[in-house]
Amino acid sequence: MPIAGSYRSIDFALSNMTNSHIQKVAVFTQYNAGSLNEHLISSKWWNFGRKQGGLFTFTPSVTAENNFWYRGTADAMAQNLSFLKNSHEPYVVIASGDGVYKMDYNKVLEYHIAKKADFTVVTANVEEKD
């Protein structure tokens, strides 16, 4: 979704990851992802170099036997579990690509570790007028 000309809503999540020093990022796309893929390829703002990790995009494998797209975030994660397992990362951040927000994921990770949590969900109260 374009915002202010050349920006996309996903830029906020990716910028948050860059600013939090996250090096390996996977983007799970759905149908009609051509424009998004072009944007991701042409943008060098995030500095996800292959030497440090990289930016990976995944589209669901639609076949004659499996004719459905991702059925939500959990399904996207499940269909790409091998990538997660092979990444050898101790923690995973799952962020929506359609939110406009600024967040330091390091603070969330510190909280997550301190609480010895299996998972941590971050939410925000939004006033009705907003």
Segments (PLM) and residue ranges:
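Unchanged
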Residues: 1-130
